[in-house]
Amino acid sequence: MSKRRVVVTGLGMLSPVGNTVESTWKALLAGQSGISLIDHFDTSAYATKFAGLVKDFNCEDIISRKEQRKMDAFIQYGIVAGVQAMQDSGLEITEENATRIGAAIGSGIGGLGLIEENHTSLMNGGPRKISPFFVPSTIVNMVAGHLTIMYGLRGPSISIATACTSGVHNIGHAARIIAYGDADVMVAGGAEKASTPLGVGGFGAARALSTRNDNPQAASRPWDKERDGFVLGDGAGMLVLEEYEHAKKRGAKIYAELVGFGMSSDAYHMTSPPENGAGAALAMANALRDAGIEASQIGYVNAHGTSTPAGDKAEAQAVKTIFGEAASRVLVSSTKSMTGHLLGAAGAVESIYSILALRDQAVPPTINLDNPDEGCDLDFVPHEARQVSGMEYTLCNSFGFGGTNGSLIFKKI
């Protein structure tokens, strides 16, 4: 069975450094950090008091105040990013094509904020105080649900929740839905709002978060000797994926082609990768096989790079394993150094960065990388963005708790 080609024709995003794709990209190329002190709840008892927050968010032109009360913030973020992507694509929905257009949008955690609020209502006032909208306001698949309802999309609607790999997995599976003929267009990505009391407290209890409260903007420092954990980030990233001939026929703007998708499992530990990065290497190898290219053809790797002691070293080793002699030449950076870790949305926003790197032939930096750790000796594009030429392929990595891994490869077109 021959697969159909899949291209990217629309992009949408909310991030800690910008509320649009272009404002975010401009900030990243300038090396700007979006990490700040948490101001929406009292953090005095918390070991970590900062995160990558979405700022100046207003969605009233898209979602009424009445409807906002029925949605956790992650759903609102996802809808706004989805609308941006749909508008960017210029796609017209008709009665004829609606059955061939769907959505694949996930979240690592879902509506944690409203889960907390409704639990408080339950404890204070009993079950009658729980909102009747509690369940649909918090479950993971509701970004896809709302967007299909808003646009009348009657194709596949799915939501994959695989922790921090959710964004990549939804995009990859959406591409396969198109490639194997079950849809012509898919809105795909991820959304997250985990900077809540329970989210910050839970990751803090696991000692996964940085506690650099005296200098939050320097807290996310992938591959640096002084890294002490990741930084939570909020936001959403959405891509419109489209079958190539369908996109050409309507004269769509094409950002890139999605040519490779690879997955694997560590089968090692609940939250830590093996030191040799074998699972990450396998995901990259599978993506390269799917794309039909050699590792040496990749110009840039947008790394998972979370700023954790174990994860950063394992990924560096995985890149060395897969790229071999080419490892010293490939550019590898972690945009999480500026945005923090958007969990289930990370792979989605970072796929967009990988696509824009192809468009502009520019690679965003890894900021805060002052003293690379032992074994972390790749070209991590420290401090400043890098202009390149002739870059044809980029690779985006995402790895999650439970040992789930995913890689995507994009091609300039």
From Swiss-Prot:
It is an enzyme of class 2 (transferase). One of its GO terms (molecular function) is protein homodimerization activity. GO terms for biological process: fatty acid biosynthetic process; fatty acid elongation, saturated fatty acid; monounsaturated fatty acid biosynthetic process; response to cold. It catalyses: a fatty acyl-[ACP] + malonyl-[ACP] + H(+) = a 3-oxoacyl-[ACP] + holo-[ACP] + CO2; (9Z)-hexadecenoyl-[ACP] + malonyl-[ACP] + H(+) = 3-oxo-(11Z)-octadecenoyl-[ACP] + holo-[ACP] + CO2; hexanoyl-[ACP] + malonyl-[ACP] + H(+) = 3-oxooctanoyl-[ACP] + holo-[ACP] + CO2; octanoyl-[ACP] + malonyl-[ACP] + H(+) = 3-oxodecanoyl-[ACP] + holo-[ACP] + CO2. GO terms for cellular component: cytosol. Platensimycin binds at T271, H304, T308, P309, A310, H341. The keyword NADP does not apply. InterPro entries: 3-oxoacyl-ACP_synth-2, Beta-ketoacyl_synthase, Ketoacyl_synth_AS, Ketoacyl_synth_C, Ketoacyl_synth_N, PKS_Beta-ketoAc_synthase_dom, Thiolase-like. Residues 3-412 form the Ketosynthase family 3 (KS3) domain. Its EC number is 2.3.1.179. Pathway: Lipid metabolism; fatty acid biosynthesis. The active site is at C164 (for beta-ketoacyl synthase activity), H304 (for beta-ketoacyl synthase activity), H341 (for beta-ketoacyl synthase activity). Keywords: Acyltransferase, Fatty acid biosynthesis, Fatty acid metabolism, Lipid biosynthesis, Lipid metabolism, Transferase. Platencin binds at T271, T308, P309, A310, H341. Changing R207G: Impairs the binding of CoA. 10-fold increase in catalytic efficiency with dodecanoyl-CoA and malonyl-CoA. The keyword Ion transport does not apply. Homodimer. Involved in the type II fatty acid elongation cycle. Catalyzes the elongation of a wide range of acyl-ACP by the addition of two carbons from malonyl-ACP to an acyl acceptor. Can efficiently catalyze the conversion of palmitoleoyl-ACP (cis-hexadec-9-enoyl-ACP) to cis-vaccenoyl-ACP (cis-octadec-11-enoyl-ACP), an essential step in the thermal regulation of fatty acid composition. Is able to catalyze the condensation reaction when CoA is the carrier for both substrates. Belongs to the thiolase-like superfamily. Beta-ketoacyl-ACP synthases family. Identified as a drug target. Inhibited by platensimycin and platencin, which are antibiotic produced by various strains of Streptomyces platensis, and by several platensimycin/platencin analogs. Also inhibited by the fungal mycotoxin cerulenin that binds in a hydrophobic pocket formed at the dimer interface. This is 3-oxoacyl-[acyl-carrier-protein] synthase 2.
